[in-house]
Amino acid sequence: MSLSAHEIRELFLSFFEKKGHTRVKSAPLVPENDPTLLFVNAGMVPFKNVFLGLEKRPYKRATSCQKCLRVSGKHNDLEQVGYTSRHHTFFEMLGNFSFGDYFKKEAIEYAWEFVTEVLKLPKEKLYVSVYKDDEEAYRIWNEHIGIPSERIWRLGEEDNFWQMGDVGPCGPSSEIYVDRGEEYEGDERYLEIWNLVFMQYNRDENGVLTPLPHPNIDTGMGLERIASVLQGKNSNFEIDIIFPLIQFGEEVSGKKYGEKFETDVALRVIADHLRAITFAISDGVIPSNEGRGYVIRRILRRAMRFGYKLGIENPFLYKGVDLVVDIMKEPYPELELSREFVKGIVKGEEKRFIKTLKAGMEYIQEVIQKALEEGRKTLSGKEVFTAYDTYGFPVDLIDEIAREKGLGIDLEGFQCELEEQRERARKHFKVEAKKVKPVYSHLKELGKTSAFVGYEHMEWESQVVGLVKGEGLVSELKEGEEGEVVLKETPFYPEGGGQIGDAGIIESDKALFKVEDTQKPTEGIIVHIGKVLKGTLKVGDTVHARVDKERRWDIMRNHTATHLLHAALRNVLGEHVRQAGSLVADKYLRFDFTHFSALTEEELKRVEELVNEKIRENLPVNVMEMAYDEALKTGAIAIFEEKYGERVRVISCGEFSKELCGGTHVSATGDIGYFKIISESSVGAGVRRIVAQTGRWSVETAFKEHQTLKKASSALGVGEEEVIQKIEELKEEIKDREREIQRLKQELLKLQIREVVKEENVGDFTLHYGVFEEVEPEELRNLADMLRQRTKKDVVFIASRKGDKINFVIGVSKEISDKVNAKEVIREVGKVLKGGGGGRADLAQGGGKAPDKFPEAVKLLKEILSG
């Protein structure tokens, strides 16, 4: 009986609904109120508190098809995914549950009825297992259902006894298997399709089992697995809801499924991981460097790495998101709602990692080669940390790559390196924290506070109420001394809300103090940080405080422009854009915002043009003070990270922009002059950054760029409008020449083969051997690959000498790899060359420190082949 996965899912849920079960919608992949789990990894997880007696539901019978993710902890299938036909990270679990209602007899009856009468599986092909001491379950299967004893297996605690933890609810289980025929072996012949858990005991701290007053039922049937049986497929990856993703991988890579094991592994990884990241991100898990986000980033980067192995060097996974959504949106309509968001996040992640993927792979291959040459069995903690920290490779991915070459990783050493980095960060944090000094609290206690008058004034007559030098209060600061000045009132704006502090001059009759920065270390205290240029400044002096007006005007232009930029981004990109951080300086502004992908040239152009349009309109910039709640009702945008009091300032630029803000601004947008975007980049998952300039600084940058264009035009000998075209032509010329160089290299190597490589018949094999001078390891592998395919009995042993180092490759025809194992042989010859190696049965590589020993290594190889 061939049924689609969607049909099987619906048949299951409908069947149990008819048996009095309430259909429960799948919970999100992120467990609710369960800090013990990163992800829902079994069908029973959403009902965990019901089983524990901590929660009551309005039903005693339930059925569900639960989204699951197994990537961490005890149930971690990540490293197996791709290498087997059954392991997945994401899968769906069909289940029926009883909370103190029916028990073994009904659970077994329902399961048997569903598999034999609804799914029409032949009874004679079905086997069951029971816990060795569960006589009740055995009798029900044997006497009530009628399964002969030879098709009932009694298994031990490891296979057929389930427990939630070391203590708590537990009980025996029973599994249903289908016999797929003699052409299959082991687990693939007798395939487990359904697990019935009879939760009838409570285990205490001493391991003592006590019967539960109301036993429960928890069953689980993997949808992908039962679909493979009903659709007659050899692998879960070939069923109707997954195989289109394999085909997607074929399409983007140009490789064919079923022709080569390594290709199949990569295509299965891509298919599985696409499902996992699509569902996880749709459920709100954004890739990051910690917790659930890090797990999803690991999955995504693992898929990218396998794509890279297939020759895919550009972002591609985001394109597959559409396919996952199209296949799965019928049972999970929420996928359609988040389609574009998921694609954007995935594409952004790919673009970030693709920049370091190639360099990271080269680095890892380099340290693997070094380890092999040195005869080490592991990559050092420092090497692993560099791959992790510099290139962004998850540790388990580094471990997987190393194991492919027969190496391990020094996990303990890696943890030490990681802890050292964290300690450096902690020390840095402690240094930063010292900025808040007890002296400021003392000033407040003395009533020596400051009032800010800088919204209306840039100059102000004031009085010195406090002087700080180092960690304490002083009565005076002399010429040449650095310190901090506290004024009764000040026009100097202290750093806050992303805006840098003002600079300027504080002058008395007898002293001149240069203000380099202004800070507000605690509420009510504004400190002017700088140096006495002339005379002596004393507490109680009357002073004239004068802000650097030109600098302040630059800052105000940038701050108002930041508001215009925020509004323009929301206008062009959508309402999802939110401020995620900002820096308003004098020479530039920096604005971080939420968005899932890099802005296109067209989007950047539209944003820049819209801001400049609003500048030309010379919109009035109005400031209003009002209650916080009232401000939000008017549509003013609040910044998530900021803390607001009951009264807030609302800055409006005409009808175009309205935000809560405590900074200083121009009085009309025309005062900004000109706005120019300098750069757009990523600062993290789902967060972009724009750096821009205004006023005189933007004009200066535009002038410099034009000067650069003029110089490029002159150097290339073309008009300014033809510079890009000329550069593209030159790039193509370089590519053509590089291709020609590669072609000539290959021709040269072929000529060298005739001169360098000798051929001898040894035993039943044809041996090709020789030493080249300074040939790259990759070219050496390619040569070995070519030579081992000449006949069906080729053994290749070629090497490349560079100084006192030697790299070498052993390759054998696939047809004889069961007789001559390259991976085993390379270890033996590697010893002679004072090194080692690893790889596959048909192709292995290594390195050593004794190039002069190559003839001896050849002699040993001949002895091995002669048998």
From Swiss-Prot:
The UniProt record lists the EC number as 6.1.1.7
Instruction: State the protein's name.
Output: Alanine--tRNA ligase
Which coenzyme or cofactor does it need? Zn(2+)
Q: What are the recorded Gene Ontology BP terms?
A: alanyl-tRNA aminoacylation
Q: One short Pfam family name for this protein?
A: tRNA_SAD
Task: Show the domain comment.
Answer: Consists of three domains; the N-terminal catalytic domain, the editing domain and the C-terminal C-Ala domain. The editing domain removes incorrectly charged amino acids, while the C-Ala domain, along with tRNA(Ala), serves as a bridge to cooperatively bring together the editing and aminoacylation centers thus stimulating deacylation of misacylated tRNAs. The Aquifex aeolicus domain can be used in vitro to replace the corresponding domain in E.coli.
Q: Which residues form the signal peptide?
A: none
- Catalytic class of the enzyme: ligase
Please give the organism. Aquifex aeolicus (strain VF5)
Q: Where in or outside the cell is it found?
A: Cytoplasm
Matching InterPro entries: aa-tRNA-synth_II/BPL/LPL (IPR045864), Ala-tRNA-lgiase_IIc (IPR002318), Ala-tRNA-ligase_IIc_anticod-bd (IPR018162), Ala-tRNA-synth_IIc_core (IPR018165), Ala-tRNA-synth_IIc_N (IPR018164), Ala-tRNA_ligase (IPR050058), Ala_tRNA_ligase_euk/bac (IPR023033), DHHA1_dom (IPR003156)
Function of the molecule: Catalyzes the attachment of alanine to tRNA(Ala) in a two-step reaction: alanine is first activated by ATP to form Ala-AMP and then transferred to the acceptor end of tRNA(Ala). Also edits incorrectly charged Ser-tRNA(Ala) and Gly-tRNA(Ala) via its editing domain.
Q: Which UniProt keywords apply?
A: Aminoacyl-tRNA synthetase, ATP-binding, Cytoplasm, Ligase, Metal-binding, Nucleotide-binding, Protein biosynthesis, RNA-binding, tRNA-binding, Zinc
